[in-house]
UniProtKB/Swiss-Prot annotation:
The protein's name in its UniProt record: NAD-capped RNA hydrolase NudC
Organism of this sequence: Salmonella paratyphi C (strain RKS4594)
Domain Nudix hydrolase: 125-248
EC numbers on record: 3.6.1.-, 3.6.1.22
Lineage: Bacteria, Pseudomonadati, Pseudomonadota, Gammaproteobacteria, Enterobacterales
UniProt-annotated binding residues for substrate: R69, E111, Y124, Q192, P193, W194, P195, F196, P197, Q198, S199, A241
UniProt keyword annotation of GTP-binding present: no
Gene assigned in the entry: nudC
Amino acid sequence: MDRIIEKLESGWWIVSHEQKLWLPYGELPHGLAANFDLVGQRALRIGEWQGEPVWLVLQHRRHDMGSVRQVIDQDAGLFQLAGRGVQLAEFYRSHKFCGYCGHPMHPSKTEWAMLCSHCRERYYPQIAPCIIVAIRREDSILLAQHVRHRNGVHTVLAGFVEVGETLEQAVAREVMEESGIKVKNLRYVTSQPWPFPQSLMTAFMAEYDSGEIAIDPKELLEANWYHYDDLPLLPPPGTVARRLIEDTVAMCRAEYD
């Protein structure tokens, strides 16, 4: 599936190494390969954006290596492709040898997979399903400040789905573990690939059922009910968390304004 980049090759360039992304001038490289010293490198076509190919190059650059979070405020489709590139780059880097027999592996020519020529085992990129849920109580929404995000941002609750667990069960468990409350009338909203490191966010809305807020201090700094017209600092646009919050605010305004 990969090929040697030629001088006149053009498109969007996802240059990635160890979950980092090359972002010269803070943006994804776009244009001729020769302009970015990519001629002769191996590249894998991973998609198309605005009629042009999107290429993945597994390479480390000495300067301007940053996080894919830096392009989150760009178009959702381009952010999704950048996330795909970072995740694939990490998959290929971490699956050079077979976990069963220890022999070297090679990329499949027909799909995103790594193959072992010795024991015939086949590996695919791992995807970790997560739930994220906006909880409404009359004209208020539950927002929390997470321990791992000490930047003042308040967001909705989220967590990984455990083995043998449905998405609905994961919502109920995560909400209870992190905030001590029960929810009802769960409704699926949307999903978003989230490359931190390889998650798939499944987004829900729910209504408060019962209980008092009792946070898990290992997960949250604080959590509280916020009136829809008096919200704290929120996640950036383009995130599924922000969409859930805005959708909840819209529902509150339709009912209470």
